[in-house]
């Protein structure tokens, strides 16, 4: 197993961004964090939004110049697209691509649209990625505390010969090199990100939670207890894992729980599960998932909306809504 090399402040030259204007397209979770961190690092940063965006006034109130996306792209040397995957292609083709040319840089925080050829930039522009491994509010908060969130960075296209230095400088400007950044590729980031979401973090975890809840309720146990044991306490365990790995979690739980972990866990996630994971990974690698998602978005998200409605009606949601009213620490 080959370990990744980490890069820090001393490895990234912030002066690469001197006299450059960076346009942040989008002002959501990541957009506001990138823009404000860049601004605080002394970078000339502007924001590109559609006219009428609810974020327009917010960005201006936070001291940023805001322009319609096409105008921002025309003014910028580097355009960072921080929009949902499914809308990037349309906005890129309409508002950004006409203003890209020799010497300009196109940047992303996720490899999806480049790797799966939803966006195909001209050969004369640099294409890079800087992807913080944390939500925008965390990227912003720890930056203001003098720290940073680890980032991935990658170069897909290096027309200028300076794309890698630009990516590292950008990562430093948003605080990434304070914690450490590691180099990857658009392919590796896109495929591992989708795999993690589908098999573990989102798809795998929610399916496991629901199956556990349903098993207890079908066996006659009270749904409230099933909720506590199969959903509510997930956070307690995950927090321990994030803080110190699986070892800290196991050191913090009872011996009974740890013994059950070792003897029963592998019966739930076994070789059949791993075989299915490999199939899902193959569907990501060969573009099948990307094609399915793009086609559904083009059909006004018909399947996606139906699945969302169905999941919202699962009994665990009603039980959870009632129980969370009892938890004062969850209320603002």
From Swiss-Prot:
Catalytic function, reaction form: (2R)-2,3-dihydroxy-3-methylbutanoate + NADP(+) = (2S)-2-acetolactate + NADPH + H(+); (2R,3R)-2,3-dihydroxy-3-methylpentanoate + NADP(+) = (S)-2-ethyl-2-hydroxy-3-oxobutanoate + NADPH + H(+)
Pfam families xref list: KARI_C, KARI_N
EC code(s) of this entry: 1.1.1.86
Domain of life, per lineage: Bacteria
Biological process annotations from GO: isoleucine biosynthetic process; L-valine biosynthetic process
Active site, UniProt feature: 110
Pathway: Amino-acid biosynthesis; L-isoleucine biosynthesis; L-isoleucine from 2-oxobutanoate: step 2/4; Amino-acid biosynthesis; L-valine biosynthesis; L-valine from pyruvate: step 2/4
Cofactor binding description: Binds 2 magnesium ions per subunit.
Enzyme class name: oxidoreductase
Binding-site residues for NADP(+), renumbered to this chain: 27-30, 53, 55, 85-88, 136
Keyword line: Amino-acid biosynthesis, Branched-chain amino acid biosynthesis, Magnesium, Metal-binding, NADP, Oxidoreductase
Gene3D superfamilies from the UniProt entry: 6.10.240.10, NAD(P)-binding Rossmann-like Domain
Ranges where the KARI C-terminal knotted domain occurs: 185-330
Required cofactor names: Mg(2+)
Family listed: Belongs to the ketol-acid reductoisomerase family.
PANTHER family assigned to the protein according to its UniProt record, in alphabetical order: KETOL-ACID REDUCTOISOMERASE, MITOCHONDRIAL (PTHR21371:SF1)
Function: Involved in the biosynthesis of branched-chain amino acids (BCAA). Catalyzes an alkyl-migration followed by a ketol-acid reduction of (S)-2-acetolactate (S2AL) to yield (R)-2,3-dihydroxy-isovalerate. In the isomerase reaction, S2AL is rearranged via a Mg-dependent methyl migration to produce 3-hydroxy-3-methyl-2-ketobutyrate (HMKB). In the reductase reaction, this 2-ketoacid undergoes a metal-dependent reduction by NADPH to yield (R)-2,3-dihydroxy-isovalerate.
This protein's name: Ketol-acid reductoisomerase (NADP(+))
Species this protein is from: Gloeobacter violaceus (strain ATCC 29082 / PCC 7421)
Gene coding for it: ilvC
